[in-house]
Amino acid sequence: MTIALGKFTKDENDLFDIMDDWLRRDRFVFVGWSGLLLFPCAYFALGGWFTGTTFVTSWYTHGLASSYLEGCNFLTAAVSTPANSLAHSLLLLWGPEAQGDFTRWCQLGGLWTFVALHGAFGLIGFMLRQFELARSVQLRPYNAIAFSGPIAVFVSVFLIYPLGQSGWFFAPSFGVAAIFRFILFFQGFHNWTLNPFHMMGVAGVLGAALLCAIHGATVENTLFEDGDGANTFRAFNPTQAEETYSMVTANRFWSQIFGVAFSNKRWLHFFMLFVPVTGLWMSALGVVGLALNLRAYDFVSQEIRAAEDPEFETFYTKNILLNEGIRAWMAAQDQPHENLIFPEEVLPRGNAL
């Protein structure tokens, strides 16, 4: 038996190699294989959003004006979700709903599914871009792992939550005021602020902001005074290899302030990565729970006592009444097709009224 030793040579004109060479070439804007997913999806998502907020009404889906053409501004314009009657239809332009009619497709809310799906794949493409570049320059993939947090939140809020409900109608519309209304909806129908996963998300995001501020200030405070420039930006050569701040001094300072301090940079920066990403993942898990209508904390004993004793009230019972008011107002406004009528006697009243 003969064993051939040596490197296997492929045809130099192999199509894959030609594509790989062109896609991964060093240029001003790196393309890469991930760019085949990222750039088209990001282009279509942004293009669909700009088109919808500029021209497309929400009269047929929500009974609202939602475009610049109708008098909205940047804060009130939105690409609105499809009507509740369309359930979870993908609303393809060539599908049975629009039948290739672009105007009808826009009226039905087709731009929302278009933006949501292309946006999700665009974000995934951006994460793959970070993986690809990290591999090319031999870095660890922690940037891509960190970016999984925002992707998890986007997918859970815009896709998984409405999939758990009766249709895309209950997802957020793509607009500033529309997102605010969705937040109020989450509070009224799910008591979201009392959900422990939301609490972890808030702790992660605000904790990360605090860590960022502390870290930036500490590094600025402990910069070496070895430059000749008039300020921080001119004092150092951007390509210098040596360290420009003192970790030892920073450790001594925070040890005196708190009694404890990070002893090395790896643990410090891993903690700065861990806090926000874990918070985002926890909030995404919480939204998945809401998609299934899971309850969070219900302090029933306080509700019963407040109902029996006019003089007993807690911040929790006040918030529950507020949630009932949100539901009574929003349900009738957002779902007129349900013909919801709430008589005066069933509307919530606090013990003080």
Curated annotation (Swiss-Prot):
Q: How does it sit in the membrane?
A: Multi-pass membrane protein
One GO CC annotation, please?
A: photosystem II
**Where is chlorophyll a ChlzD2 bound in this sequence?**
118
For this entry, the protein name equals Photosystem II D2 protein
MF annotations from Gene Ontology: chlorophyll binding; electron transporter, transferring electrons within the cyclic electron transport pathway of photosynthesis activity; iron ion binding; oxygen evolving activity
According to the UniProt record, list the residues that bear N-acetylthreonine. 2
Entry's family note: Belongs to the reaction center PufL/M/PsbA/D family.
Domain of life, per UniProt, equals Eukaryota
Phosphothreonine is found on 2
Origin organism of this chain?
Populus trichocarpa (Western balsam poplar)
